[in-house]
């Protein structure tokens, strides 16, 4: 089982992915075909329509990521304002780097710790705790103050930014995981799109709003009152999670978590080694894809600066923030349309198409940088298409792969690890790319082109990993993986009667109490109780 995801021959490596991709494609299949191919849970009824009872919990859980996108992106507004307000006192201090870096650390801590909480305590409890933390620490960042010195204020903001990072990270292995499990209760052929809309599209929408709200506040308060602008920009981020908190109170855990959780398994008997052997390879591949995506995003963002510099060389704060709204809007078409395609072509092929196209366009933009600088309108259009493909492919589907390639028993930890490694990739990018730019400082063009070449090449490598090494991810991937995981644990001597909440009976537990006897004469199947 430790090698189940590895290619078993040269032919399997070269051509095995073709049949796997075909099995994920739903384009052209009728509703009856999708129902026939779908693997259902033991007591699950066939869903043929998207119903609010299943759609609403998926939305309520995933929509919390809007706040994550809003608050996380809103920190850039804070930094912009602090540069204007405090000048060299801020830019030449450690505070500028600390506020950004400490957020990464907090996010990783939140992703890993709440991944464990989500699996071993309760999905809903973890999500509500993350929600409360997000409300509280967002508010603390908005009102941050300590003593009467500027350095005291910087230190206070840094501390609260760390805890806000934990809250943001906590939403990933709780909200996203719950959204994937409720999306799994939707009709086959519709599951991937709703997960993508309620997770990645929510984050992207948060980016858009977080760039537009400061612009509106700037119109109201003018650049003379930037303290009010940045504090209100962050503070308004409290409202969405506050509303969601009361909606989430009425939610319940998903069916798959109730049946598959390992809360009743004693810690000393927890099958850690079996889990590692079963999932090590696919978790490594999914995490590496996420790492590359987040790592590359930093260098891709440098082209924003180039375009703004060419369009408005001496732009005002209004103009700079206005263009920020435009750049963030580029994400939305990719996130929306990619969600549809993810259902029709499957997440692996969709991700590979998106990240592959992004790599090719990125190489072309780098090679033609001098020409593009002279045609700013064309540069903006090409960069917009480039950004759209980023959300169309990896933006939508990295989280989807992380949530559907493992069993419900360990989904929070699995997702949390993959997301944390992705976030580490973003952090590494903030250090690697400036070093590359510094190395090529003698040439303005090379200092911009080389990081883009590196990131674009990694995008193509990511497409290769997705096609050849990620396991099949069909519409019924969650149910299939739950069954395979149960069988694997049972074969290795784990008492699977401990799976699930107390009182929740699975088909496997029923089979322990019911014997199945075949009558050889008429080939009929009779069921009788054991020990009778």
From Swiss-Prot:
Record's keyword annotation contains tRNA-binding: no
Protein name as it appears in the record: Glycerophosphocholine permease GIT4
Annotated function: Glycerophosphodiester transporter that mediates uptake of glycerophosphocholine (GroPCho) with GIT3. Does not possess detectable glycerophosphoinositol (GroPIns) transport activity. The expanded ability to utilize GroPIns and GroPCho results from the organism's pathogenic nature and its need to occupy a variety of environments within its host organism. This possibility is buttressed by the fact that GroPIns and GroPCho are present and abundant in human fluids.
Keyword Transmembrane among UniProt keywords: yes
Chief location category: membrane
Gene Ontology cellular component terms for the protein in this record: plasma membrane
Spans traversing the lipid bilayer: 55-75, 98-118, 126-146, 150-170, 201-221, 229-249, 272-292, 321-341, 349-369, 375-395, 416-436, 450-470
Species this chain originates from: Candida albicans (strain SC5314 / ATCC MYA-2876)
Family that this chain belongs to: Belongs to the major facilitator superfamily. Sugar transporter (TC 2.A.1.1) family.
Localization (cell): Cell membrane
SUPFAM superfamilies, alphabetized: MFS general substrate transporter
Induction entry: Expression is positively regulated by the transcription factor PHO4.
UniProt xrefs under InterPro entries: MFS_dom, MFS_sugar_transport-like, MFS_trans_sf
Key words, A-Z: Cell membrane, Glycoprotein, Membrane, Transmembrane, Transmembrane helix, Transport, Virulence
Residues with glycosylation annotation: 266, 314, 396
Record's catalysed reaction(s): sn-glycerol 3-phosphocholine(out) = sn-glycerol 3-phosphocholine(in)
GO biological process: carboxylic acid transport; glycerophosphodiester transmembrane transport
Signal peptide location: none
Protein's membrane topology: Multi-pass membrane protein
Deleted gene: phenotype: Triple deletion of GIT2, GIT3 and GIT4 impairs the uptake of glycerophosphocholine (GroPCho) and reduces virulence in a mouse model of blood stream infection.
């Amino acid at each position: 089982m430790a090698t189940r995801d590895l290619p078993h021959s040269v032919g399997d490596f070269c051509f095995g992915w073709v049949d796997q991709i075909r099995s994920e494609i739903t384009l052209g299949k009728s509703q009856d075909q999708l129902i026939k191919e779908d693997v259902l849970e033991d007591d699950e009824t066939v869903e043929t329509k998207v119903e609010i009872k299943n759609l609403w919990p998926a939305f309520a859980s995933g929509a919390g990521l809007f706040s994550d996108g809003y608050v996380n992106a809103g920190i850039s507004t804070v930094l912009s304002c602090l540069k204007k307000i405090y000048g060299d006192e801020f830019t030449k201090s450690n505070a500028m780097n600390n506020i950004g870096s400490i957020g990464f650390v907090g996010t990783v801590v939140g992703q890993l710790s709440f991944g464990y909480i989500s699996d071993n305590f309760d999905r809903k409890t973890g999500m509500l705790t993350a929600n409360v933390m997000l409300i509280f620490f967002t508010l603390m960042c908005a009102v941050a103050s300590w003593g009467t010195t500027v350095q005291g204020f910087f230190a206070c903001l840094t501390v609260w930014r760390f805890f806000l990072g934990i809250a943001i990270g906590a939403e990933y292995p709780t909200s996203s995981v719950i959204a994937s499990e409720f999306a799994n209760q939707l009709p086959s052929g519709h599951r991937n799109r709703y997960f993508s809309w309620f997770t990645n599209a929510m984050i992207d929408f948060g980016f858009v709003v977080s760039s537009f709200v400061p612009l509106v506040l700037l119109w109201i308060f003018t650049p003379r009152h930037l303290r009010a602008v940045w504090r209100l920009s962050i503070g308004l981020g409290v409202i969405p999670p506050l509303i969601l908190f009361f909606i989430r109170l009425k939610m319940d855990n998903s069916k798959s978590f109730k049946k598959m959780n390992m809360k009743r398994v004693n810690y000393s008997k927890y099958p850690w080694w079996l889990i590692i052997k079963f999932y090590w390879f696919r978790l490594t591949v999914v995490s590496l894809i996420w790492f590359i995506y987040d790592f590359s995003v930093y260098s891709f963002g440098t082209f924003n600066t180039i375009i703004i510099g060419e369009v408005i060389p001496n732009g005002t704060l209004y103009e700079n923030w206005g263009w920020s709204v435009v750049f963030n809007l580029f994400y939305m078409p990719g996130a929306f349309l990619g969600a549809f395609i993810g259902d029709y072509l499957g997440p692996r092929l969709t991700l590979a198409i998106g990240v592959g196209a992004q790599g090719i366009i990125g190489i072309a933009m780098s090679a033609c940088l001098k020409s593009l600088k002279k045609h700013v309108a064309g540069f903006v259009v090409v960069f917009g298409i480039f950004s759209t493909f980023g959300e169309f492919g990896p933006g939508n589907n990295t989280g989807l792969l992380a949530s559907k390639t493992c069993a419900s028993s360990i989904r929070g930890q699995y997702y949390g690890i993959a997301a944390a490694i992705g976030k580490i990739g973003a952090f590494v990018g903030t250090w690697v790319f400036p070093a590359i730019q510094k190395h090529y400082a003698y040439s303005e063009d090379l200092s911009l082109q080389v990081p883009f070449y590196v990131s674009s090449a990694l995008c193509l490598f990511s497409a290769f990993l997705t096609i050849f090494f990620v396991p099949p991810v069909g519409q019924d991937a969650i149910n299939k993986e739950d069954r395979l995981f149960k069988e694997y644990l049972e074969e290795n001597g784990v008492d699977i009667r401990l799976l699930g909440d107390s009182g929740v009976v699975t088909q496997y537990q029923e089979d322990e109490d019911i014997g199945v006897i075949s009558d050889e004469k008429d080939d009929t199947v009779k069921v009788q109780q054991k020990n009778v």
